[in-house]
C-alpha cells in the first residue's frame, strides 16, 4: 500500500552517512524478502509431498505476491527515499502506486485465506473440511485474492477517483521548491481512504481474528480433554506409558500452536495496523501527518512481506527440511525415508458433541497442514480429510 504523501524527506534531505545507513537497511529488507519468498516457491515446486498439501497453494501464491512487492514496489520506493526525488515520470508513478496497492492488498487477502483454511481444517469435522476446501473453491479463493484488489488499485487510481477534491494539494506537494525535486505523491480523499482501508485491511483483519480465536479455543479444549484423560487414567496401572508420553506431547503441541497464533496475529497487526489507522485518520485532520511517519508505517508494512516466509513456511518442519536440502545441494544428510511425507500421528477428541482430529502439524506455525492419519483404532480413519 503506497504512502499518501510521498514527500517524506526533510527539507534538507539525508546526509551522506544517513543515506548509507538507510540504503543498507532498505537493501537488506528487500533482499531478505526476495530470497525468502523465492525459497518458499522453489521448495513447493521441488517437493512433490509439499505440493499435495492444500494450504501450500495459498502459501505459494502469498510468496509470489510478496516477491512481486519486493521486486516491483520496494526498490523504487527505496530509490526515491534515498535520492529524495522521483525520476521515473508521472505515468510510472501511477503504475507503481497501483501495483503497490494491488500487491500489498493481495498479500493481506492471502493471509486471510490461510486463516480460513486452517479454521475449516482444525475446528470443523474432517468431512466438512473436505467439502469446503475443494480444488474449485481453492481456485476461486486464490482468484479472488488477485482480482478483488484491482477494484481498489488500478481502477480508481488510473481514473483519478482517489484524488477528487484534493488535486490542488497533490500538485502542491509534488514539487519541492527548496530542492527543485519532484515526488511520486499519492494522496487519497475520504471516501477512498475509508473504502480502501476497510476492504484491504479491516475486513481481512476481523476474519483472521475470528478464525484464529476459534482455532485457539479448539486447541485449548482439546488440551483440556487430554488433561482429563490423563487424570482419569493416572490411578490405573494398566495405562500404557506411551499414552502418557503422547498426551504430554499433545499438550505441548497445543501450547506451541497457541503461541504461534499470537506471533502471527501480533506480527500482522504490528506491521499493518499503524498504516491503515493513519490512512483513515489523515484525511480527517487535513493531511497533517508528517511524511516521516508515513514512511515509517509504509515500510513497516513492507517488512511484513519479508516476515511472511518465516511465519508461514520456515516454522514448518517439512519446509525447513526442504530448504536445507535445496541450500545444501541435495545433501543426503538431510534426507530420510519418506522425507517430507511422513505420517504424523494425530489424536482425536470430542468437543461440543463433535469428534475432532487435531493434527500434530498445528505445531508447524500458521501453516499446520500435514499428511496426518489418526491411530488405527480411531473411528475417523475413513473420514480423515485427504491432502491430495
Curated annotation (Swiss-Prot):
- Disulphide bond pairs: 93-184
- Major place of localization? membrane
Which domain of life does the UniProt lineage start with?
Eukaryota
> Which keywords does this Swiss-Prot/TrEMBL entry list?
Cell membrane, Disulfide bond, Endosome, G-protein coupled receptor, Glycoprotein, Membrane, Receptor, Transducer, Transmembrane, Transmembrane helix
Q: Which residues does the annotation flag as glycosylated?
A: 7
The molecular function terms of the Gene Ontology recorded here are: G protein-coupled serotonin receptor activity; neurotransmitter receptor activity; serotonin binding; serotonin receptor activity
Q: Which Pfam families match?
A: 7tm_1 (PF00001)
Q: Where are the transmembrane segments?
A: 20-44, 55-78, 93-117, 134-157, 189-212, 258-283, 291-314
User: A single GO CC term, please?
Assistant: glutamatergic synapse
Q: Which SUPFAM superfamilies match?
A: Family A G protein-coupled receptor-like (SSF81321)
What topology does it adopt in the membrane? Multi-pass membrane protein
Q: What sections of the sequence does the record tag as coiled-coil?
A: none
Outcome after substituting residue 100 to N: In D3.32N mutant; abolihed binding to serotonin
**Residue spans, topological domain Extracellular:** 1-19, 79-92, 158-188, 284-290
Question: What SMART domains does the annotation carry?
Answer: 7TM_GPCR_Srsx
Q: In the UniProt annotation, what is the result of changing residue 104 to A?
A: Decreased G-protein coupled receptor activity
> Please, one GO biological process term?
maintenance of gastrointestinal epithelium
UniProt-annotated binding residues for serotonin:
100, 279
Q: Write out the topological domains of type Cytoplasmic.
A: 45-54, 118-133, 213-257, 315-388
Where would you find this protein in the cell?
Answer: Cell membrane; Endosome membrane
Protein family (similarity comment): Belongs to the G-protein coupled receptor 1 family.
Q: Quote the record's domain comment.
A: Specificity for G(s) G alpha proteins is determined by the length of transmembrane regions 5 and 6 (TM5 and TM6).
- Summarize the subunit comment: Interacts (via C-terminus 330-346 AA) with GRK5; this interaction is promoted by 5-HT (serotonin).
Q: What does this protein do?
A: G-protein coupled receptor for 5-hydroxytryptamine (serotonin), a biogenic hormone that functions as a neurotransmitter, a hormone and a mitogen. Ligand binding causes a conformation change that triggers signaling via guanine nucleotide-binding proteins (G proteins) and modulates the activity of downstream effectors. HTR4 is coupled to G(s) G alpha proteins and mediates activation of adenylate cyclase activity.
Q: What is this protein called?
A: 5-hydroxytryptamine receptor 4
Q: Which organism is it from?
A: Homo sapiens
Q: Taxonomy-wise, where does this protein's organism fall, top ranks first?
A: Eukaryota, Metazoa, Chordata, Craniata, Vertebrata
Amino acid at each position: 500500500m503506497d504512502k499518501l504523501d510521498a514527500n517524506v524527506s526533510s527539507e534538507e534531505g539525508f546526509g551522506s552517512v544517513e543515506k548509507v545507513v538507510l540504503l543498507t537497511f532498505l537493501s537488506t529488507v528487500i533482499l531478505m524478502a526476495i530470497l525468502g519468498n523465492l525459497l518458499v516457491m522453489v521448495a513447493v515446486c521441488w517437493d512433490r509431498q509439499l505440493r499435495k498439501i492444500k494450504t501450500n497453494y495459498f502459501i505459494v501464491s502469498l510468496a509470489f505476491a510478496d516477491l512481486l512487492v519486493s521486486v516491483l514496489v520496494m526498490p523504487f520506493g527505496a530509490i526515491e527515499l534515498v535520492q529524495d526525488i522521483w525520476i521515473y515520470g508521472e505515468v510510472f508513478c501511477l503504475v507503481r502506486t497501483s501495483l503497490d496497492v494491488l500487491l500489498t492488498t493481495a498479500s493481506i487477502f492471502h493471509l486471510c485465506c490461510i486463516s480460513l483454511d486452517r479454521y475449516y481444517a482444525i475446528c470443523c469435522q474432517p468431512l466438512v473440511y473436505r467439502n469446503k476446501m475443494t480444488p474449485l473453491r481453492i481456485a476461486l479463493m486464490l482468484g479472488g485474492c488477485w482480482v478483488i484488489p484491482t477494484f481498489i488499485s488500478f481502477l480508481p487510481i488510473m481514473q483519478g477517483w482517489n484524488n477528487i477534491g484534493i488535486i490542488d494539494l497533490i500538485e502542491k506537494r509534488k514539487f519541492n521548491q527548496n530542492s527543485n525535486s519532484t515526488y511520486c505523491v499519492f494522496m487519497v480523499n475520504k471516501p477512498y481512504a475509508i473504502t480502501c482501508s476497510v476492504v484491504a485491511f479491516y475486513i481481512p483483519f476481523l476474519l483472521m481474528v475470528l478464525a484464529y480465536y476459534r482455532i485457539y479455543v479448539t486447541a485449548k479444549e482439546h488440551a483440556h480433554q487430554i488433561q482429563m484423560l490423563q487424570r482419569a487414567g493416572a490411578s490405573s496401572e494398566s495405562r500404557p506409558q506411551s499414552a502418557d508420553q503422547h498426551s504430554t506431547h499433545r499438550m505441548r503441541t497445543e501450547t506451541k500452536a497457541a503461541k504461534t497464533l499470537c506471533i502471527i496475529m501480533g506480527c500482522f497487526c504490528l506491521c499493518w495496523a499503524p498504516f491503515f489507522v493513519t490512512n483513515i485518520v489523515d484525511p480527517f485532520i487535513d493531511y497533517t501527518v508528517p511524511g516521516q511517519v508515513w514512511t515509517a508505517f509504509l515500510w513497516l508494512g513492507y517488512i511484513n512481506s519479508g516476515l511472511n516466509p518465516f511465519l508461514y513456511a520456515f516454522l514448518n518442519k517439512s519446509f525447513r527440511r526442504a530448504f536445507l536440502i535445496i541450500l545444501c545441494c541435495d545433501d543426503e544428510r538431510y534426507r530420510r525415508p519418506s522425507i517430507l511425507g511422513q505420517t504424523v500421528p494425530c489424536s482425536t477428541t470430542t468437543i461440543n458433541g463433535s469428534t475432532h482430529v487435531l493434527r500434530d502439524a498445528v505445531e508447524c506455525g500458521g501453516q499446520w497442514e500435514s499428511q496426518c492419519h489418526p491411530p488405527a483404532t480411531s473411528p475417523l480413519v475413513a473420514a480423515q480429510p485427504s491432502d491430495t
